[in-house]
Amino acid sequence: MYDIVGTNNSILIANVLVLIIICLLVVIVGCALLLILQFVFGVCGFVFKFVCKPTILVYNKFRNESLLNEREELLCDNV
């Protein structure tokens, strides 16, 4: 009897299926990497918001006070 699918066609179908599976794996891995990156950026944003930002604000406050003190000293020295 005759085969419905010839040898060349079966190899072609197998190659197409392999390509489809590879594409699906690439999409799944890409989505997983994007989720991981989103998590990392979220954690970094959280750390910056609650740890680094207050530290920067305190630093700026003391720096501004120091500059004001220097300005007052310079003004007092000139008088």
From Swiss-Prot:
The chain crosses the membrane at residues 17-37. Keywords: Apoptosis, Host Golgi apparatus, Host membrane, Membrane, Transmembrane, Transmembrane helix. GO terms for biological process: disruption of cellular anatomical structure in another organism; viral budding from Golgi membrane. Residues 1-16 are virion surface. Plays a central role in virus morphogenesis and assembly. Acts as a viroporin and self-assembles in host membranes forming pentameric protein-lipid pores that allow ion transport. Also plays a role in the induction of apoptosis. It comes from the Viruses. It is a single-pass type III membrane protein. The keyword Membrane applies. Residues 38-75 are intravirion. InterPro entries: E_protein_bCoV (IPR043506), E_protein_CoV (IPR003873). This is Envelope small membrane protein. Homopentamer. Interacts with membrane protein M in the budding compartment of the host cell, which is located between endoplasmic reticulum and the Golgi complex. Interacts with Nucleoprotein. Disulfide bonds: none annotated. It comes from Bat coronavirus HKU9 (BtCoV). It is found in: Host Golgi apparatus membrane. Belongs to the betacoronaviruses E protein family. The keyword Transmembrane helix applies. One of its GO terms (cellular component) is host cell Golgi membrane.
